[in-house]
């Protein structure tokens, strides 16, 4: 049984070759066409010397060619490297070097950056350039145009046998440090992200053909992963569809109105988002309606919206539940180091304080500092941990591998640093990443919980919470806030709103107002940037109880 990503896609290709696999505005690619084009690119890469285990970078927005390239890389047992298209040159150089990349497939719009980085990354010998409507010159480094590479190569599927042990690498976002390459076996990542388990029960899919056969027997779902494919959640929404003969909508840019237009035009069934950063502009656009027709968007085919990997505030969920009655809205937990961890169904007005409250499967648990499971309903906070199908470690980073992948009581766990509370019914309420938690007066404060409380105020569009040095408390809980256009709010008003949702010691006591909150393309927070903002200038407002120290707002 070859539980390999390329094999699983090929099963669907063999059963539903005539179905549309990928669609973008004005263009569709069937499974048969996807097979031919991916085979051609795979043969081209092999002809250029790319061997099994070699690293191939994909530096692209959400395009059909990016998907073809991923599959081509897997077909020849090479390793795909996800390259963040917002990276500046020194960040690109880090990824190229750290991954030991030997080939690169990129959109033409990034040619200037590639030209500046390649002289310092001599391992990269092959560059394929995807036309994207721009005219940036790539002749300086001898890149070949994507369609030309395909035209000169074989369309046949005549590759060597693959293995479930082939390596898949997913680079983390790097918002709290350098990006790290998380190494998975193909079978393991399929089990926890690709449909190899039932996400509600944790039960294994036993037959490698099961997803393709079930998909062939039913009308294929139309899925629209909105986050960029550099993000693991978007990649695996894509592959879940390709394994089961579904149709995936690819769109390179994000805007609230574009999302609803695409759902309307393509009759989408399921969309995937990453929390508030995408949800807020989508909500605003949904409330405004279609600007071209003056009518609401037709969302009759949409039945589910799935959020993962970023804070999805209760107030945002409630607005969606009001505007999308009858639709299923889910919030999932997970990370590059654990894959899927648990899922919750949104319910109006339901919040226990913190992040999402989810039902976990038998492979996910919450451990105390000694590696023992936290008792449900104890009120204790512990580390989210996953066992079973987990990564091998970080690429070329033994120290961080030892820190994250630990053994307790003879069991190997992945413990990426997320903290949670186990409720009396066994569900888990996420609190946040320990590496960005704030220690204020001996109390640990998790930014996501505070951010969710601040976003309850109608004037707040986005917010990040960090700790700043404080002589009395060690760290002062502080907020960097972006307001909605035309809105104004005081720190006192923000504190009042937050205090109604969280304990007083968690309430921000200083605020910096900014035009826009910096996030990754996938919507993940950049806490280093937020911390920098607090050092660039004095706070716009600081709470002070009269002792000059800005004492804690205890309510």
UniProtKB/Swiss-Prot annotation:
Its EC number is 6.2.1.42. Residues 525-555 are annotated as: Disordered. Pathway: Steroid metabolism; cholesterol metabolism. One of its GO terms (biological process) is cholesterol metabolic process. Keywords: ATP-binding, Cholesterol metabolism, Ligase, Lipid metabolism, Nucleotide-binding, Steroid metabolism, Sterol metabolism. Gene3D superfamilies: 3.30.300.30, N-terminal domain of ligase-like (3.40.50.12780). GO terms for molecular function: acid-thiol ligase activity; ATP binding. It comes from the Bacteria. It catalyses: (25S)-3-oxocholest-4-en-26-oate + ATP + CoA = (25S)-3-oxocholest-4-en-26-oyl-CoA + AMP + diphosphate. Residues 544-555 have a biased composition (Low complexity). ATP binds at residues 172-180, 418, 433, 524. It is an enzyme of class 6 (ligase). Catalyzes the ATP-dependent CoA thioesterification of the sterol 3-oxocholest-4-en-26-oate to yield 3-oxocholest-4-en-26-oyl-CoA. It can also use beta-sitosterol, campesterol and 3beta-hydroxy-5-cholesten-26-oate. PANTHER family: LONG-CHAIN-FATTY-ACID--COA LIGASE, NONRIBOSOMAL PEPTIDE SYNTHASE PES1 (EUROFUNG)-RELATED. Belongs to the ATP-dependent AMP-binding enzyme family. This is 3-oxocholest-4-en-26-oate--CoA ligase. It comes from Rhodococcus rhodochrous.
């Amino acid at each position: 049984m070859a539980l390999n990503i390329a094999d699983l896609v090929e099963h669907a290709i063999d059963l539903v070759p005539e179905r549309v696999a990928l669609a973008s505005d004005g263009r569709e690619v069937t499974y048969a066409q996807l097979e031919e084009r991916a085979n051609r690119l795979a043969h081209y890469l092999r002809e250029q010397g790319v061997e099994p285990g070699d690293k191939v970078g994909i530096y692209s927005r959400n395009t059909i060619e990016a998907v073809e390239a991923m599959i081509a890389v897997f077909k020849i047992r090479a390793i795909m490297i996800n390259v963040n298209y917002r990276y500046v040159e020194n960040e690109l150089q880090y990824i190229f070097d750290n991954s030991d990349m030997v080939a690169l497939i990129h959109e033409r719009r990034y040619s200037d950056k590639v030209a500046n980085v390649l002289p310092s990354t001599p391992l990269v010998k092959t560059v394929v350039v995807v036309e994207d409507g721009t005219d940036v010159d790539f002749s300086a480094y001898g890149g070949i145009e994507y369609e030309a590479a395909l035209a000169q190569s074989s369309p046949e599927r005549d590759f060597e046998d693959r293995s479930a042990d082939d390596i898949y690498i997913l680079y983390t976002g790097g918002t709290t440090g350098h990006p790290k390459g998380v190494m998975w076996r193909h079978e393991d990542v399929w089990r926890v992200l690709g449909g190899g388990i039932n996400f509600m029960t944790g039960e294994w899919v036993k037959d490698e053909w099961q997803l393709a056969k079930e998909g062939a027997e039913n009308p294929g779902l139309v899925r629209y992963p909105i986050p960029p494919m550099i993000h693991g959640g978007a990649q695996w929404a894509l592959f879940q569809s390709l394994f089961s003969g579904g149709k995936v909508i690819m769109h390179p840019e994000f805007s609230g109105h574009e999302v609803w237009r695409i759902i309307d035009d393509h009759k989408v069934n399921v969309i995937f988002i990453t929390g508030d950063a995408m949800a807020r502009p989508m909500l605003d656009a949904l409330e405004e309606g279609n600007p071209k027709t003056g009518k609401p968007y037709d969302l009759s085919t949409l039945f589910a919206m799935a959020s993962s990997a970023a804070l999805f505030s209760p107030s945002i969920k409630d607005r969606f539940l009001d505007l999308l009655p009858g639709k299923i809205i889910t919030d999932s937990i997970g990370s590059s180091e654990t894959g899927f961890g648990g899922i919750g169904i949104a319910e109006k007005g339901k919040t226990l304080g913190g992040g999402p409250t989810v039902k976990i499967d038998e492979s996910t648990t919450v451990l105390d500092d000694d590696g023992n499971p936290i008792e449900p309903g104890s009120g204790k906070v512990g580390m989210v941990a996953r066992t079973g199908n987990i990564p091998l470690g970080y690429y070329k980073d033994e120290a961080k591998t030892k820190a994250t992948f630990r053994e307790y009581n003879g069991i190997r766990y992945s413990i990426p640093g997320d903290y949670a509370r186990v409720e009396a019914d066994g569900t888990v309420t996420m609190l946040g990443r320990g590496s960005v938690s704030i220690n204020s007066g001996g109390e640990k404060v998790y930014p996501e919980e505070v951010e969710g409380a601040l976003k309850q105020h109608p004037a707040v569009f986005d917010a990040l919470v960090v700790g700043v040095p404080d002589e009395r408390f060690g760290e002062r809980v502080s907020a960097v806030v972006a307001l909605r256009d035309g809105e104004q709010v005081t720190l006192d008003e923000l504190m009042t709103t937050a205090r109604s949702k969280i304990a007083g010691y968690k309430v921000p006591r200083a605020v910096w107002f900014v035009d826009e909150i910096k996030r990754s393309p996938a919507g993940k927070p950049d806490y280093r940037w937020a911390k920098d903002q607090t050092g660039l200038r004095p706070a716009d407002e600081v709470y002070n109880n009269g002792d000059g120290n800005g004492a804690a707002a205890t309510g």
